[in-house]
Structures are given as C-alpha cells and as structure tokens.
Amino acid sequence: MLLKLFLTFMKIGIFTFGSGYAMLALARKEVVELNNWLTPQQFTDAVSLSEITPGPIMVNLATFVGTKLRGVPGAVVATLGLIIPPMAVLIIVTKLYIDLKDNSIVQKLFKGIRPAVIGLIATVIIKLGKTALVDYK
C-alpha cells in the first residue's frame, strides 16, 4: 500500500501542470474513482481542510490521504511521492529554460499551456461543486 501511495502521488505530481488546484482533477480521479480511497464527499471535505490549513493544498491533501490510509508512514510516503519527482523535473526544466528562454518556440509553448490549465481548474470546480452543494441534482 505504501508503494501504491507513493506511485499514485508521484503520478499526480509529475503529470499535472499549474498550481495545486490544477492537480486536483487528477488527484480526484486517482483517489476517488480509480483507487476508492475516499468517497466523493470525503474528497471534497479533504480539499476543504487542505485549503484552510497552512501550506500548499496538494501537499496537505497528500498528507491527509496518506494519514487516513496508513497513518504517519502513509503521510510521509504520499507527500514525498508528490514533491520529490516534480522537484527533480523542476531542476532540469529550470536549467533548460535558462538556456532556451529567448527561443520563440519555447515562448509559444508556454502560451499554449495556459488554456489547458484553465480547463483543468474548471473541471475541478464543476466536480467539487456537485458534491459541495447540498441536495444538488
């Protein structure tokens, strides 16, 4: 279970771009739909708690899910799974960006990513809104 927690949150950390809010769509899919670790309502509650506690929302959410499933070891593993791989990618991308920042193709790529991030955030708002609203039909 600890390895699955690590790999799941590593996947969330590597394959999403943007803020922690952009990560929530994939997190919900992994935690609620694919692994059935939390119900939709529990996930919405976990997101709410993650927002009001100090720190980045996804780190808080990973810590919450890990704690719920496997206590302190689960919290550590889920959190490390989320932050270690993206930090490695960030170091590599930063080096590449410094070397290629004036390249017109790189500038166009960054402009192209923006609409995708907006779409991901809109998806999260809709899915969380459905479970957050009482008596939503």
Q: Can you annotate each of these PLM segments?
A:
Residues N60:
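Conserved beta-loop-alpha segment that forms the PLP phosphate-binding cup at the N-terminus of a helix
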